[in-house]
Amino acid sequence: PSRFWLINRKTAEIEYNVIPAGDVRLRVAQTGQLDVPDTYLACQYENVATVLIDGTEVTLSQNPGRNAMASWTRNGFDYLLLCEEPQMNLLGGVIQDFVTQTTASTVSGQQVTQE
């Protein structure tokens, strides 16, 4: 990971540098609380497909050469992988690793404070 932060105290975001295409961002939040960027929500995707990866239903939304995202839900958490201007089907090339190797959990007794 190259950077990470918390958005609106509910959504964690981790930025990864994927060579050669640049950055992808992974967002995770408890189910129903995921903050999706407006630029991705407002987009009309040319290609939308649902695929099964390791028993998890994943929705891929892509526009060739423009924004792409993959979303899935597992064990009480929503996941969203975001790519801006992906090259050579970057999303399709990395999505299996993100779906199969990413897990999230809550931390009991911890309180997030703002400084």
List each language-model region with its residue ranges.
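Short, solvent-exposed recognition patches
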Residues: 1-78
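Surface-exposed amphipathic alpha-helical segments
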Residues: 75-115
